[in-house]
Amino acid sequence: MKDSRGKRRCLAFLKGLRLKTDPNLPGAKQKTPFNISRFWLLVIIVIYTATSACIYFDWSAIRNLLLTVGKYKHLNVGDYPDITLSPQYKRINSLYPITLAIHFTMSVFCGFLYDHIGPKFTAIIGQMCNIMSWVFLSIDSTTVDTTFLSFVFLGLGADTAFIPILTISNLYPDASTFILTVVGAAASLSYAVPATLNFICRRYPSTPFPYICYGYIFLILVPCLLVATFLLPLMPFKGLDYYIERDQSRRSGAEGDAHRGRRGDPKMVTSQTNDEVDVEMQPFENAQSEASKGRSGNGSNTPSTRGNTPNGGKQTRGKTTSESNRSSKGEGSAIQGVEEEDQATNSSKGVNEEDSDFHRKSISLFFKVLLSYPSICIIVYFILFNISTVFYGMVTDTYFSYDRSIINIINILMPISCIPCIIFGRFINRYGSAIIIILMNAFSALMHLTALIKHRAAGLVSAFLYMCVTSIYTSQIYCFIQNSFPSVVFGKLLGFASLCGGLFSLLCEKLYDQIVSKDGASIDPTNVVLLLVIAFILMFLPLTVLYFRKYERSIEDLHQEVAMSQSSGRA
């Protein structure tokens, strides 16, 4: 009896995880370039991402490729029994934190470009940087450090080509966070690119490395550039919060008109200009009940223009809000950004006026959001997470010097990390990303501790945890930001979080110097690992607060709430 009950509960849980998307939602019907269906656009973007995203995140494979083709070999003055102690190895390893720092520093500029000039031109800039990167890598020179220049451009192009495609998630408004992790899973597949090129170099040693580089440029990067040019929109697709705000504003306006009609009062009861912005960080737990009362309680009230003028139109002077419905206890959403949009016109004058106002408002809102608790907490977490992951990638050869086969297993696991990424994405779409962030915090500590145990079983556990951590490397941050903050500042906030993570990753080079003995004969990462583990343990407290205060909205619960409110409105 108990077994059958448990089985039914398990089946009910699995059925609850089944994802259904509604193609009739307003966001799903947005116009796409060449009217391509949202499904085929997603397929093309997945291929685009899998072949040209952050390929250097599997640093072990990149390092092996550079060693195979002899980059920096001229730095070695003799033979080294342990390659990890050679100047060539150290120089190649130093490229990782530098590239990551450039990558994430560029992210903040990419975020502004995404929000203000749109995904198309941002992605074009990114792919041009990627092409330049491989052009420089194909050049073998000892007078000019072309390898360093190559990784500079690789860092510049990584997020600049990747972040713009995240706008595809807005075409799936009831599954947006899951789509973000699907794209993140495709990025995990891109980890196979350096391993594949390394295999080609080893299999066909007579093939000059520049030929391989140009083959990658013309077969992969040029088609990706064409995708960015023709299939990405000029302005980001509008998010779910835009349509919720518009619908609730209209219903609130209709209710207000009816109320005034009964009282015979032709004037507005209350109005608020678009210049007044109130940003209030509060838990999301009461947002849905507020939404059902007619207030915009979707967790990010600012219209999801993501850089475009709201609805491309002109706002009316008397924009009403439902502030009167706010309870005295301060119930609210994660971000109370009071900005709304009304009737659209096609006049270019209206668009230009709104453009000017939008940029000023968006930047002002960004700085207010930046100082909120969830923003600070998630940025601090990402800094620690980034340092941990980069350091692990730099010392894999040291961790597993007793069994090199584990490193080969890591190279295999990295591309297939797309599988746990999709699984995590499904849970994020249903339960929010905060719980997954807490899980990744635990995994990050455990992967270092198990790596210190010189045993094959512990090493395999560490490799598996590393795969899980890297599978959702930045997707966890993307999803939290999308669920918790106004989508109008998505690019800027994401870019700033990446900037902080990237700059602090430069500490990894100093940490690596600390674990090398003074005579350069041995490497012991134990002290640094213990420091990282203590930091992760301390991080559990603010992350737990973040989870229980419910700063982020559940996409699926919100969609159900919207559907109910729309049906009641029609009734």
Curated annotation (Swiss-Prot):
It comes from the Eukaryota. Keywords: Amino-acid transport, Glycoprotein, Membrane, Transmembrane, Transmembrane helix, Transport. Active at pH 6.5-8.5. Its main location: membrane. It catalyses: L-arginine(in) = L-arginine(out). Sodium-independent cationic amino acid transporter. Transports L-arginine, L-lysine, L-histidine and L-ornithine. PANTHER family: PROTEIN FMP42. This is Cationic amino acid transporter 8. It comes from Plasmodium vivax (strain Salvador I).
